[in-house]
């Protein structure tokens, strides 16, 4: 069975944490296809700071050394907000016989009940939840705990060989990097070069982004 991983985010900007996390995931799971999915206008997050075109360009630059990583722009190409359930339905229509795995952070898991039609997501894809140590002490919503009790299975073969319906928690490494922090540091003219791919850093400076 063809296995597909979908890593969604604003990538505003894409940073080394995104890349290192993805490399760790691929080293452990080895998905046949791995897509970075830039969101258009997340319904439960503030609007992005860079334009859609700029965010895609930064992704292209960041992924140049990694030809196995692809970019999927279907959310940017839609006129509607970035509702993940619609995106997964679109993937499922295109890849009817493949396993789909949506990669989210542990914070995303805790916020899952806030997602539009979130109950449908587990029927459309598996969930690969990246463990974030700082969230471990937060109470898990009852609805999410019910999902974990019913669907959690940390066997990677389940993700690779089942169309949907499993939740796997995986420690992909801890990287103290966030797009929010990078934007704040750039605005304060602090050095962020070590947290960004070189080509992305050069692009941000050239475009004078996040000033």
Curated annotation (Swiss-Prot):
- One of this protein's Pfam families, by short name? CTP_transf_like
Q: Sum up the protein's function in the record's words.
A: Catalyzes the reversible adenylation of nicotinate mononucleotide (NaMN) to nicotinic acid adenine dinucleotide (NaAD).
Q: What is its EC number?
A: 2.7.7.18
- What's the protein name? Probable nicotinate-nucleotide adenylyltransferase
> Which GO molecular function annotations are given, in alphabetical order?
ATP binding; nicotinate-nucleotide adenylyltransferase activity
Can you name the source organism?
Answer: Legionella pneumophila subsp. pneumophila (strain Philadelphia 1 / ATCC 33152 / DSM 7513)
What this protein catalyses is:
nicotinate beta-D-ribonucleotide + ATP + H(+) = deamido-NAD(+) + diphosphate
Q: Which Gene3D superfamilies match?
A: HUPs
One GO BP on record is: NAD biosynthetic process
Q: Where is the signal peptide?
A: none
| Enzyme class (EC, first level) | transferase
Return the similarity comment.
Belongs to the NadD family.
Name the pathway it acts in.
Answer: Cofactor biosynthesis; NAD(+) biosynthesis; deamido-NAD(+) from nicotinate D-ribonucleotide: step 1/1
Q: Which domain of life is it from?
A: Bacteria
Q: Does the keyword Nucleotide-binding apply?
A: yes
Respond yes or no to whether keyword Cell membrane is given for this record: no
Q: Which cysteines are joined by disulfide bonds?
A: none
């Amino acid at each position: 069975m063809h296995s597909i991983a979908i890593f969604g985010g604003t990538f505003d900007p894409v940073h080394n944490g995104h890349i290192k996390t993805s490399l760790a995931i691929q080293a452990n799971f080895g998905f046949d296809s791995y897509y970075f999915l830039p969101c258009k206008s997340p319904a439960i997050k503030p609007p992005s700071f860079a334009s859609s075109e700029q965010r895609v360009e930064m992704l292209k630059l960041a992924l140049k050394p990694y030809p196995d990583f692809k970019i999927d722009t279907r959310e940017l190409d839609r006129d509607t907000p970035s509702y993940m359930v619609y995106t997964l339905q679109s993937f499922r229509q295109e890849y009817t016989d493949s396993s789909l795995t949506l990669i989210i952070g542990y914070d995303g898991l805790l916020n899952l009940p806030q997602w539009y039609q979130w109950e449908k997501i587990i029927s459309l894809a598996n969930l690969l939840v990246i463990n974030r140590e700082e969230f471990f002490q937060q109470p898990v919503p009852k609805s999410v705990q019910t999902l974990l009790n019913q669907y959690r299975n940390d066997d990677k073969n389940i993700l690779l060989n089942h169309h949907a319906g499993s939740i796997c928690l995986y420690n992909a490494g801890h990287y103290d990097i966030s797009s929010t922090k990078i934007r704040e540091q750039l605005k304060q003219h602090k050095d962020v070069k070590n947290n960004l791919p070189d080509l992305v850093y050069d692009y941000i400076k050239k475009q004078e982004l996040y000033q």
